[in-house]
Structure formats: structure tokens, C-alpha cells
């Protein structure tokens, strides 16, 4: 008598987030999306956080990725969750877009953060207009940078 194998477990339910054919799905990455893309024409400087942040919001809203910035789309805690890998891929794309939208002199002042929402929060704390003393400190640091004996590449 042959033994029957138990049936395989059912696939996880298709939710609005796992249906990548849905153009409104925030986890959908279009083929035209590239981690090297600069989202806005005006890069972040110490003076322009307000206008820059509005431009970033518009760009990410247009790409349906604003939830990664404002924290409404959070990383699933279970690595077996079908959204875990999707979240990581989209979050990495948003982090890359943010980093590419920061002027070169400021990139060294921006911490390496793997979470788009945490990076956004850090940028707000450092560069928002109500943080005048920090902006002054950054301008002063930038104004006093010297090459010394470093090569141009190192500098």
C-alpha cells in the first residue's frame, strides 16, 4: 500500500502588497528605477533643506515610495514574511535615491543608515531650519576644510 505524502502547505495569501502587478503597490519596482538615480535637480545643502525635502516628498510620492520615508511601511520582523525581501529591496532603493540627492560636501556628515525612515529622521534633525546652530556648525566646518598634505583623491 502506497503512502500518500501530505499536501504542500498553501501559498501565502496574495495581499495588496504581494501583488506586484498592481501599479499602486509601494513594493513594486519599475524596470526604469535605478539606485544611481538622482531624484531631484537641487541637491541637499546646508541652506535648502525645506525646499529639498518638499521636492523629495513629491518625487517619492510619484513613485509610491513615501511610506518608506515617513515610516508607515515598516520592515517585517519575520524574515520568512513574503514582504521581508520586498521591503528590503525597496528600502535600499529609497536609501540610494536619498544618498544620491545629497551634495558631495554633506555626504560625509550623513551617517550610513540602512533604513530610509531613520535616514530621513536624521536628515531632518541635522538640516531642518529650526536647527540653526547645527547648520552654523556645519558651515563653519565646511569653510575650514583644508587639503593639507593629502592627495586630491584622499581629500
Identify what each model region corresponds to.
Residues 1-155:
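N-terminal Lys/Arg-enriched interaction segments
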Amino acid at each position: 500500500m502506497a503512502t500518500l505524502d501530505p499536501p504542500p502547505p498553501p501559498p501565502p495569501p496574495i495581499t495588496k502588497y504581494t501583488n506586484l502587478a498592481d501599479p499602486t503597490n509601494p513594493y513594486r519596482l519599475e524596470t526604469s528605477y535605478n539606485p544611481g538615480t538622482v531624484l531631484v535637480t537641487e541637491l541637499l545643502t546646508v541652506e535648502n533643506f525645506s525646499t529639498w525635502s518638499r521636492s523629495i516628498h513629491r518625487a517619492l510620492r510619484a513613485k509610491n515610495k513615501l511610506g518608506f520615508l515617513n515610516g508607515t511601511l515598516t520592515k517585517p520582523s519575520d524574515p520568512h514574511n513574503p514582504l521581508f525581501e520586498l521591503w528590503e529591496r525597496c528600502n535600499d532603493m529609497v536609501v540610494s535615491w536619498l544618498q544620491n540627492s545629497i551634495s558631495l560636501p554633506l555626504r560625509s556628515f550623513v551617517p550610513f543608515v540602512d533604513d530610509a525612515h531613520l535616514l530621513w529622521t536624521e536628515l531632518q534633525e541635522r538640516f531642518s531650519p529650526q536647527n540653526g546652530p547645527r547648520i552654523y556648525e556645519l558651515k563653519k566646518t565646511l569653510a575650514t576644510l583644508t587639503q593639507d598634505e593629502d592627495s586630491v583623491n584622499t581629500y
